[in-house]
Swiss-Prot record:
This is UPF0235 protein Sama_2480. Belongs to the UPF0235 family. Pfam families: DUF167. It comes from the Bacteria.
Length: 95
């Protein structure tokens, strides 16, 4: 599986998450996954909520259309974005 996969109108993102980073950014590839650095700590679901909010803003969809399919308790996550309005350039290069 590649880092970003199309499934009908949805996108599946394979992410490796680095919490408590100095800023939110897409770092690049980490093996077969996209490395996403986020400022939120991995406590009480704050990192997961931050990922959903960050990706919803980037892909211009409501937060409810971003869901973590796999990996809620770990750094390796599979995130579904339902019918994204746009695909940001920094993500599009990995399609």
């Amino acid at each position: 599986m590649s880092a970003i996969t199309r499934q009908d109108e949805d996108l599946l993102l394979a992410l490796y998450v680095q919490p408590k980073a100095s800023r939110d950014e897409l770092v690049g590839l980490h093996g077969e996954e996209l490395k996403l650095a986020i400022t939120a700590p991995p406590v009480d679901g704050k990192a997961n909520a931050h990922i959903c909010k960050l990706l919803a803003k980037a892909f211009k969809v409501p937060k409810g259309k971003v869901s973590i399919e796999r990996g809620e308790l770990g750094r390796h996550k599979l995130v579904r974005i339902q019918a994204p309005e746009i695909i940001p350039d920094d993500f599009a290069q990995f399609l």
